[in-house]
Amino acid sequence: VEYGRYLLGSDTKALCPYPEIIGESEIKIPGVTPISGWAVETSITEKVVDVDNRNEFVAYLDADKCGRSLTVRSRIDGDHFQPLGFDTPKRLNRFMIDLKIPQTWRERVPLVCRDGQVIWVVDYRIDDRYKVTADTKRVLKIEFKRV
């Protein structure tokens, strides 16, 4: 029993919706990058688009703040990020506990990083410092699709 869920069986990771991510992989921008059971699709638009936040597997970020070198990895001890809407950074572990992400799933949640810094906890929240604003000139769209 974890956060009001009953998990039967000896391997609760088998019920995890995220494929295991091994190591750290660079994302092609723009393009499609296959990563551990995911197809990560990226594109850049020169104007601000209507940001649709209904799909948690799609993020819209300020492309100029993100740069051209992003990676995907799982969490490591000491990770911090500034969740959208927060004024200060938060420990990733505390963020996951607060959202009641099952402990056995936390190692598998994909993280998009820039220079080792988490900028998107896929399926949950982007980093506030990389959000699209009125001053954004180019928008980076990143979409994770299961394969």
Task: Show the residue positions of the predicted features.
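AMP-forming adenylation/ATP pyrophosphatase catalytic core
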Residues: 1-147
